[in-house]
Design a protein with these regions (language model features):
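Short, low-complexity Pro/Thr/Gly
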Residues: 1-190
């Protein structure tokens, strides 16, 4: 007699059979623009997806401009990433992309309402204030976003999963940040 499983039970069995789990990496910080961060994926289990959380705290200073307020757009939180890549030591790189292009690519796959900034909730998936009011002394700007980098075609694609526990496999995530002047699109005089 065949056993009837619910969708939730099938999903739980798939997660159990493929040994999917979340493994955190150490937090790293950048003190100035133009820097590069490198994360090495631990040699444990299988890799199907990488989540990268970027939390930015910037200081925006007003220069000679008469304007004291600038508006941000939907791609502002992603503009600070100049290059994002996942590199394997066999020469394959599933991602070599800049932040804005990644946001546009992800909008095809994900719900745009969670991908693009919410201006009210600082704890959401992506946050950026709608407007920045700057002074000559400087104004703090806080932005937050999460990059979801799938390595497989879909969640049920066992062929695309990378065997990270192999001693020969080396997986690195490299994040190149823009310089301070290119992190935001701002008018002259700022």
């Amino acid at each position: 007699m065949a056993q009837t499983l619910t969708v939730q039970q099938r999903n739980a069995l798939f997660a159990q059979a493929t040994r999917q789990n979340i493994q955190g990496l150490t937090r790293k910080s950048v003190k100035q623009g133009g820097s590069t961060l490198t994360f090495e994926i631990p040699k444990a289990r299988l890799l199907s997806k990488v989540w990268l959380e970027v939390d930015a705290k910037l200081k925006v200073k007003k220069g000679t401009s008469s304007t004291t307020e600038i508006a941000t757009d939907k791609l502002t939180p992603y503009q600070m990433i100049r290059r994002l890549s996942i590199d394997l030591n066999n020469g394959w790189s599933p991602y070599v992309i800049d932040g804005k292009s990644f946001a546009i690519l992800s909008s095809i796959r994900q719900d745009c309402h969670t991908l693009f900034p919410q201006h009210e909730d600082e704890t959401g998936y992506c946050y950026c204030p709608a407007k920045i009011t700057a002074s000559e002394a400087g104004t703090s700007l806080h932005m937050h976003t999460v990059f979801e980098l799938p390595v497989t075609l879909n969640d049920r694609d066992p062929i695309g999963i990378i065997l990270a526990q192999s001693p020969e496999t080396l997986i690195e995530i490299k994040v190149d940040f823009e310089t301070e002047n290119n992190m935001l699109t701002i008018p002259d005089g700022w």
